[in-house]
């Protein structure tokens, strides 16, 4: 009886609120609120010696609790923390050729190694056993990034009895990645690090001129950590027609991750708070993912634990990962596949069009970015859920054309502090932060009112796709967010 009474009272309170309007709601989003929330994340990180928000660490726990408490105290949402256990990994490393040290980054979940050995250049992209020369045994395999997951390359190198592996980038600049937790049916990993394209090419030239020896040391640490997603759904609105949006709460080891992805989660939090002034026709679900940087673990866990009925209640998913890059471009996920010949599930084209129309309405240029599997939309796409979102670029280099569009610096990364210690409050572009947060608010208000542009989903197709959700090596290549010209989070750096 008490629950029925409370539901009746809640319905009455919500009924007294005006329906959220896409024309007006974006104006409720203020820069000062975005910056206040971002500062809180930096404070969490800098309160501890690690100065980061890696999943399962104290600053990340503080982040999760902050989001939970801020949403809970509104009284507008049903909020819970979803517990899960994931394997954490970190490593120190050195790579030398003679007395010269080469910058290298150990891939997440790599085993340890200490070896001095010649380099063996692997044919093609190292994605099949035939690519590994017979004399790779006991040597360090040098493999080009591309085509298959880093975990596959590492396993194949181990099968060829390589002493260790080096993967070099296929675009300018350094690289890192994740192997994904080891899969017993695949075989053990070889120790593996990533280096830049330039350093990879130097090693190839030395190897072609004669043998070249490297000294590689990797000290890898791993432990299971308990961590949490935060889920908050409006108490009002149709719970069978859910508008879902999300971003990830964790950073890499190197820094506090205030753009990657503090910008996305704080934008969503500010929007969630502002939404409490209004009523909605369709339920809105805010999702805050853990352990994205280790292979989209939180979002994969969440989606894999939904049955077909619950999956079909989610009419669409919007992803916001790095929306305030300092040298930004305004990028929209290519839902219709017109730019990258890879469309999202039915309804994704309409999401892309909504964001395009919004930017057009305020005379802002925009470009598409690829659904490359490198952020938390992947599990939703693989389950047939229409998806979309925004991105402002990571380690990718801004072109002259894009610099002219947004007044940025050509020849410079969209985010020069991507996955680095400098991804703090000073790394945020305030203009991009506010523009994209207002665009997000517009989308939320639109779909909270009307989902008629998004086709109903089919249970059978969802079940068919679901089996593919938990991929053996996590996301794809480095979050280079493969995004068109922006690259991005190695969230995905599972795939070369």
Curated annotation (Swiss-Prot):
Positions of the UniProt region annotated as Disordered: 475-496
- Name the Gene3D superfamilies for this protein: 3.50.30.30, Zn peptidases (3.40.630.10)
Q: Which residues form the active site?
A: 292
Query: Which range is the signal sequence, renumbered to this chain?
Result: 1-16
- pH effect on activity, per entry: Optimum pH is 9.5.
The terms describing its cellular component in GO are: extracellular region
Task: Look up the domain of life of the source.
Answer: Eukaryota
* UniProt binding sites for Zn(2+) 2: 260, 293, 419
> Where exactly is the site Transition state stabilizer?
418
Temperature dependence per UniProt: Optimum temperature is 55 degrees Celsius. Retains 65 and 46 percent residual activity after a 20 minutes incubation at 70 and 75 degrees Celsius, respectively.
Q: Please list the GO biological process terms of this entry.
A: proteolysis
Function as written in the Swiss-Prot or TrEMBL entry: Extracellular aminopeptidase that releases a wide variety of amino acids from natural peptides.
Q: Which family does it belong to?
A: Belongs to the peptidase M28 family. M28A subfamily.
What's the subunit arrangement here? Monomer.
Name of this protein: probable leucine aminopeptidase 2
Biological source species: Aspergillus oryzae (strain ATCC 42149 / RIB 40) (Yellow koji mold)
Q: Which gene encodes it?
A: lap2
